[in-house]
Amino acid sequence: MKKLLTLLLISGIVPFATAQNEADKWFFGTGAALDFSSGSPVVISSPMNTSEGTAAVSDATGKLRFFTNGVDVYDSTKTIMPNGTGLMGDVSTTQSALIVPNPAASSQYYIFTAGADGAGDFRYSIVNMTLNGGLGDVVLASKNTLLTDS
């Protein structure tokens, strides 16, 4: 009886579950990008030129928020954000940037950057999505904050 009740409960909830689409857009290479929001990859344009190590984030509906190569940060209109140049990641580092939502502030994201291979520095910058008319801004006071240095 317990198994039947569990099955009925799950089958009643599943149709109401919604997908998380925060990773629908991928930006990489020389002007290359893909949009997976339709279920199949669709080529879209990108102003970014990089050899490796990019990161992008969309909202839960799949709408692009911003993307970066670890050096420049682009908003959803594919324009560099205010204070969005000069991050200290390295475009030839395999994973030069990682975007993580700030658990304490839903309108903010951390961009973690890694410098050139062997340099050993690991930094973060904060993007505040309430600034610049909702397109986001790299918060100058947090830009390139050093976490580790070897």
Model-found features: residue ranges?
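Intrinsically disordered, low-complexity boundary segments flanking structured domains
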Residues: 11-15, 99, 131
